[in-house]
Amino acid sequence: MNRTKGDEEEYWNSSKFKAFTFDDEDDELSQLKESKRAVNSLRDIVDDDDDDDLERVSWTGEPVGSISWSIKETAGSSGSTPEGREQLKGRNSFYTQLPKPPSTYSLSSFFRGRTRPGSFQSLSDALSDTPAKSYAPELGRPKGEYRDYSNDWSLSDTVQRLRRGKVCSLERFRSLQDKLQLLEEAVSMHDGNVITAVLIFLKRTLSKEILFRELEVRQVALRHLIHFLKEIGDQKLLLDLFRFLDRAEELALSHYREHLNIQDPEKRKEFLKTCIGLPFSAEDAAHVQDHYTLLERQIIIEANDRHLESSGQTDIFRKHPRKASILNMPLVTTLFYACFYHYTESEGTFSSPINLKKTFKIPDKQYVLTALAARAKLRAWNDVDALFTTKNWLGYTKKRAPIGFHRVVEILHKNSAPVQILQEYVNLVEDVDTKLNLATKFKCHDVVIDTCRDLKDRQQLLAYRSKVDKGSAEEEKIDAILSSSQIRWKN
């Protein structure tokens, strides 16, 4: 189809398609004209006056209502009077006011594409003749910091940065091979924190089956994961891991630890009952059985004692009210409680100390030590005496202490036992030096004097004479011994 030159120009001028040109300035000028037409169309939409077809011009020759005219009028009216500034401030209250540098060019000249005196020639000239201004320049950063965001660190560099506590994303390690190499690199650093950090990433991005399978052949990382799961209390994942590794005993122990999260005593007791048949070792199985039995008895004792305390009919609960519940307490604490509140009960009751001793196979030393502390706290000295008194087959009585009488003396003194009680048990200490030290420490004067006399140690007796009160019975006793002619002193 043949067209004349005039037809082609008419086509390109009337068509919405623009001919390609290598002239950048013409291209920019056309874009500016398009922008001007868009702005004028907005003005036509907003303007509701009936005389839209009348073009009004200002004293400068610019059409009234154009963008340049609006900017000048707004700047002139708002900046000239305080009322105008307040009005402008009210209209722009939702925006942050930024200081604007004074401008020497008008937007109308840009839209027309022609120059004005004292202004820039054109937009293209302004861009080409003047240096580019950046009103919000980006601060320069070290090149190394940009690598944190571009994620171009190697495996070794990533692990090194993790070790130093630097920011380093692991998300770029997407394939299983890359993740496993990252884990091996972390293990080779022998840093538990780095290994744990990588394991947390693998735990989040890998399925349980793949994670467990790969850790099964990496024992160092496996131990770190087990420790981490125990620390955060993720029992479910820990049970799945032990089940995958076929570690029956550790699986049972992890299941047993879940009782710590059960607060209700009855529910905890029922849970412990389900743990009895789990594949524990022989020693652990006995402990689990004892734990269940102990909690079962504590529930019975607690209910009975709460009733006795509320009724107020028992002297021991009136004089010494309970400070805490016995539920979920250790075995030794339960034994102390029984020795304190139920010491005289018969062996057939659950709260009897003797019953607890036999049921849980409490050693004699532990039982005597606990019972002594409980009865001495109540100042029940007859019970203390009976605790250490034994009879032989001929009916003779003898005092015997599985824990040693030196410990008995210390516990009695801690509970403010009378001097007569202390002296009785200090005399039962077999080692002479220990006896003298305890007697001197707790001011058992008669024991010190008699021991020095038996040792025929005149110098030590004279030295002790200066420690007693003058004119006291102890001083008179020392003087009588020193003046005795029947004693052959060794010094």
Curated annotation (Swiss-Prot):
Keywords: Cytoplasm, Cytoplasmic vesicle, Differentiation, Endosome, Phosphoprotein, Protein transport, Spermatogenesis, Transcription, Transcription regulation, Transport. It holds the Pfam family Vps16_C. The modification Phosphothreonine is found at residues 21, 115, 130. The modification Phosphoserine is found at residues 119, 122, 128. It is found in: Cytoplasm; Cytoplasmic vesicle; Early endosome; Recycling endosome. GO terms for molecular function: protein-containing complex binding. Residues 72-101, 121-141 are annotated as: Disordered. One of its GO terms (biological process) is post-translational protein modification. The keyword Transcription applies. Residues 72-81 have a biased composition (Polar residues). The keyword Coiled coil does not apply. GO terms for cellular component: cytoplasm; early endosome; Golgi apparatus; late endosome; recycling endosome; vesicle tethering complex. Interacts with VPS33B. Associates with the homotypic fusion and vacuole protein sorting (HOPS) complex; impaired by VPS33B. Interacts with RAB11A. Proposed to be involved in endosomal maturation implicating in part VPS33B. In epithelial cells, the VPS33B:VIPAS39 complex may play a role in the apical RAB11A-dependent recycling pathway and in the maintenance of the apical-basolateral polarity. May play a role in lysosomal trafficking, probably via association with the core HOPS complex in a discrete population of endosomes; the functions seems to be independent of VPS33B. May play a role in vesicular trafficking during spermatogenesis. May be involved in direct or indirect transcriptional regulation of E-cadherin. Belongs to the SPE39 family. Vipar-deficient inner medullary collecting duct cells display abnormal expression of membrane proteins such as Ceacam5, structural and functional tight junction defects and reduced E-cadherin expression. This is Spermatogenesis-defective protein 39 homolog. It comes from Mus musculus (Mouse). The lineage of its organism: Eukaryota, Metazoa, Chordata, Craniata, Vertebrata. The gene is Vipas39.
